[in-house]
Amino acid sequence: MTIFDNYEVWFVIGSQHLYGPETLRQVTQHAEHVVKALNTEAKLPCKLVLKPLGTTPDEITAICRDANYDDRCAGLVVWLHTFSPAKMWINGLTMLNKPLLQFHTQFNAALPWDSIDMDFMNLNQTAHGGREFGFIGARMRQQHAVVTGHWQDKQAHERIGSWMRQAVSKQDTRHLKVCRFGDNMREVAVTDGDKVAAQIKFGFSVNTWAVGDLVQVVNSISDGDVNALVDEYESCYTMTPATQIHGEKRQNVLEAARIELGMKRFLEQGGFHAFTTTFEDLHGLKQLPGLAVQRLMQQGYGFAGEGDWKTAALLRIMKVMSTGLQGGTSFMEDYTYHFEKGNDLVLGSHMLEVCPSIAAEEKPILDVQHLGIGGKDDPARLIFNTQTGPAIVASLIDLGDRYRLLVNCIDTVKTPHSLPKLPVANALWKAQPDLPTASEAWILAGGAHHTVFSHALNLNDMRQFAEMHDIEITVIDNDTRLPAFKDALRWNEVYYGFRR
């Protein structure tokens, strides 16, 4: 069972009574056939639920009102099978607060050249019925997605499925609670921000809990539960000699397991699905949570270090979006560069907290090593390299008057050498279009040093996310040129300033 099983998407057909009962009967039959086929053949993440035809303003308004108040409804897919006068949709669309997708399709793929008549034309009017619906969306300045293609087309299936992931993610975000253990890293700017504005814009809440409250829960974990979890570690990971039974760091592994169990219990009891820590506020914990955070991220929790609640929330959102897809998604940080003409590279990592969902190795190494930051006992961590291939790094920043999402398309590569003195998980990548352009554009746009790294999601996914939440997106990819990029930043400043 996944989070998508908790939601459904309503399939709504727009028509009118002008064409008579026989046409409406055929429309209903077509809709039933299409919905059944999509549910069985399209591999959509959510179930489509066919609703009664929308043929009058009252019927359409009722559907939109019911969608708003049904917690299982993640959004609406609308198909204008015949012409459906768009003034009938105004009241419903005015109140609709769920995501909306217009499926611009028709029942038949090919025209029946020898038999086509006006009855056929009246029945299959997506071509201009969809344009009428599009006008009222534009007139009302209402954001909605449009997918064009035959309902049996795999590309259309994939695009609808991708939109469904965004719709479910948006509903999950409205209920998301972010727990901050301690505050921000002192004097850091980009990890701070307006939590009230974030809740108004996205729906997630951010609150702080004392580390001492967490420590109480950690200390209540039984030795039996700790030992059972360590047994799981031994089956999932390659344990270094120091972490094995009778190893000199075995106690550190036991403490890491206790922290993991305590953190998970605290988060579950509070209904949290994202959290932050900071190495400057560890009072009562015996080590910086490293292994615990890595494993919780792999279970779907959002996380970021140093109190960075925006990145923690974004990671949770992207975890939901990517559920069931190939490839992982993790907290990440641009750490250091490798400058080599024609082969500039970025080494991404963090002190400890990189999600093993992006690991290249089937069994990461579990080790305990010294960490100078934090002033605590040596922490346990998983060590691995990252899968290779196309990926993205994304950053959500607070500009005061708006939120900006930055996305850099990257290509992860194999680490060419071992890193015997760097016992942390890492990712190595080439930034698009090149490191100088990518880094300069990122800096000019104010991108954070913390990001969400993903092999599972792509630029189109993040564009949909930005559109659905009505926020600015700034893209750095192979098409980026700095002069045009700077112009786009200036234009966006005017556009979003005008909208205030």
Swiss-Prot record:
Query: Which SUPFAM superfamilies does the entry mention?
Result: FucI/AraA C-terminal domain-like, FucI/AraA N-terminal and middle domains
> One biological process GO term for this chain?
L-arabinose catabolic process to xylulose 5-phosphate
Identify a single GO molecular function assigned to this protein.
manganese ion binding
Q: What is its EC number?
A: 5.3.1.4
Show the PANTHER family listed in the entry.
Answer: L-ARABINOSE ISOMERASE (PTHR38464:SF1)
Complex formation: Homohexamer.
What is the protein named? L-arabinose isomerase
Q: Which organism is it from?
A: Escherichia coli O157:H7
Question: Species lineage, top-down?
Answer: Bacteria, Pseudomonadati, Pseudomonadota, Gammaproteobacteria, Enterobacterales
Q: Which gene encodes it?
A: araA
